[in-house]
Amino acid sequence: MSTTPGRKFFDEHLDYIFKGDLDGMIDKQYTEDAVLISPFDILDTPPPHIVRGRAALKAFFRKYMDYQGAINVESLYDFAETEDAISFQAVFTSKTGKWVVGDAWYMRDGMIAYHFSFAHNIGGAA
């Protein structure tokens, strides 16, 4: 259950992912000029990847979800928020294995302007 504005935003973010509504997630939660820095090795060039703008984010997240498949969040911890930032760590499993991830979102006008992603595979397929 959401108890704070940041947690509500996070819960909505996961809901978009679980429903497969990546376009909705990007359009409603990321600024038009948003930047994602990702460690996931899913593009033709090695990571880290710097992805800019909604169109590129949509393409990246589609590849990312194809790579991961269904995601099962096992734990969420170190969740923190301020008026312009949200950060958290989580453990999840997917078809690529078990991951420890961390994300930091810098917010502008209630949307993600900068998304910093960190990840380490701790077991499984990847």
Where are the regions a protein language model picked out?
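Charged, low-complexity, helix/coiled-coil-prone segments
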Residues: 1-10, 44-51, 100-106
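A beta-strand edge to alpha-helix "cap/lid" segment located at domain peripheries
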Residues: 5, 58-126
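Generic preference for well-ordered secondary structure
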Residues: 9-10, 14, 18-20, 41-45, ...
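A solvent-exposed, acidic/Ser-Thr-rich amphipathic alpha-helical stretch
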Residues: 23, 27-78, 82
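Short acidic-aromatic low-complexity motifs
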Residues: 2-35
